Amino acid sequence: MYEYKAKVIKIVDGDTVDFDVDLGFNITIRVRGRLMDVDTPERGHEDWKLATQELRMLIASERDASGYVTMTTTKTGKYGRWLVKVGNINKTLAEKWPYRTAGNA
């Protein structure tokens, strides 16, 4: 696993987030991250707003004084999004919305 400091730019839905990832040496890249082990309702489905709002609150509690979260990742999923873990957020969301099949999207 690789660990990075990142700023959350946009919460796409309850399991997808856009980050500006700090690579060091004043180098930052923007990536779309998919929370590992979590599968929240998609936009337009029941509980979509609830899942998205819960993620928003969890991210707010994970931010450090500079506004960064710590994310870990090793690979991209089948749709090109980085599969990420952000503090304890994945574990908390997976209790309500676990990813039910092998692998991850």
Positions of predicted regions on the chain:
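Small beta-barrel nucleic-acid-binding modules, primarily SNase/OB-fold domains
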Residues: 1-105
